[in-house]
Amino acid sequence: MAKQYDVLFRLLLIGDSGVGKTCLLCRFTDNEFHSSHISTIGVDFKMKTIDVDGIKVRIQIWDTAGQERYQTITKQYYRRAQGIFLVYDISSERSYQHIMKWVSDVDEYAPEGVQKILIGNKADEEQKRQVGREQGQQLAKEYGMDFYETSACTNLNIKESFTRLTELVLQAHRKELDGLRTRASNELALAELEEDEGKPEGPANSSKTCWC
C-alpha cells in the first residue's frame, strides 16, 4: 500500500480573536467558509496532506484561541511548531497593532528558527479596510517574514500562503531531509509519530518523519 505521507510537521495559527484564523483553516483543509463567527475555545486542529516538490507533506495545523484567558494553554503549542502564521484583520487596526505582541510571544515560546508568515486576512472587506497593504508589507519586512493578504470568503491566497509556509519549513530542514534520504535510499525517512488523532503507533519500519 502506498504510504500516505513522507514527512509530518505542525503549523500554528495565532492572532487576535475574530481575525479569521478558523475560517482560514477550514477553507484550506475542507474548502469551506462559514460567515458566522464562533470563537475557538482553547486549541483545535485539522490535518491536510499536500505535495511539495514531490514530497508528500502531512500538515497538522493548530488553530489557537486569541482570547487572553486561553493564552496559558495556547502558548504550550508554540514549542512544537515548525511554522507559524501571524494573522491580523485588515479591517481592524487593533489586531494589526497587536502583531508585535504575538511576535514577542513567538520569540519567547517557539523554537529558534521557526518559520513565520504574516497574514492580513479578510481582504474581501475592502470597504472596511483600516490597514493598508503597504503597512502589512512593511511590518513583514521588519520581522523578516513573507506577507500575504488573504480572504477565506473568496479563497484569495489560501493555498498559496499555506504552501509557502510548508516550503519554508522544508527548506529549513533540508539538511535533515537530505540525510534521511541518503540513509533510506529511495525512501524519504524513517520515523514514527502519533498524530494526536488517537491512532496507535505504527510499525518501526514506516517511512515517515516528523520534525515535532
UniProtKB/Swiss-Prot annotation:
Activation/inhibition comment: Regulated by guanine nucleotide exchange factors (GEFs) which promote the exchange of bound GDP for free GTP. Regulated by GTPase activating proteins (GAPs) which increase the GTP hydrolysis activity. Inhibited by GDP dissociation inhibitors (GDIs).
Cofactor section: Mg(2+)
Chain residues carrying a lipid of type S-geranylgeranyl cysteine: C210, C212
Signal peptide: none
Any single Pfam family the record assigns to this protein: Ras
Signal listed as a keyword: no
Annotated Gene Ontology cellular component terms: endomembrane system; plasma membrane
Location of the motif Switch 2: 63-80
Residue numbers binding GTP: 17-23, 35, 39-40, 66, 121-122, 124, 151-152
Record text on subunit structure and interactions: The GTP bound form of RAB15 interacts with REP15. Interacts (GTP-bound form) with MICAL1, MICAL3, MICALCL, EHBP1 and EHBP1L1.
UniProt comment concerning the protein's domains: Switch 1, switch 2 and the interswitch regions are characteristic of Rab GTPases and mediate the interactions with Rab downstream effectors. The switch regions undergo conformational changes upon nucleotide binding which drives interaction with specific sets of effector proteins, with most effectors only binding to GTP-bound Rab.
Region (Disordered): 192-212
InterPro entries: P-loop_NTPase (IPR027417), Rab15 (IPR041826), Small_GTP-bd (IPR005225), Small_GTPase (IPR001806), Small_GTPase_Rab (IPR050305)
SMART domains registered for this protein in UniProt: RAB, RAN, RAS, RHO
Protein name: Ras-related protein Rab-15
Role description: The small GTPases Rab are key regulators of intracellular membrane trafficking, from the formation of transport vesicles to their fusion with membranes. Rabs cycle between an inactive GDP-bound form and an active GTP-bound form that is able to recruit to membranes different sets of downstream effectors directly responsible for vesicle formation, movement, tethering and fusion. RAB15 may act in concert with RAB3A in regulating aspects of synaptic vesicle membrane flow within the nerve terminal.
Family: Belongs to the small GTPase superfamily. Rab family.
Membrane-topology descriptor: Lipid-anchor
UniProt keyword terms in alphabetical order: Cell membrane, GTP-binding, Hydrolase, Lipoprotein, Magnesium, Membrane, Metal-binding, Methylation, Nucleotide-binding, Prenylation, Protein transport, Transport
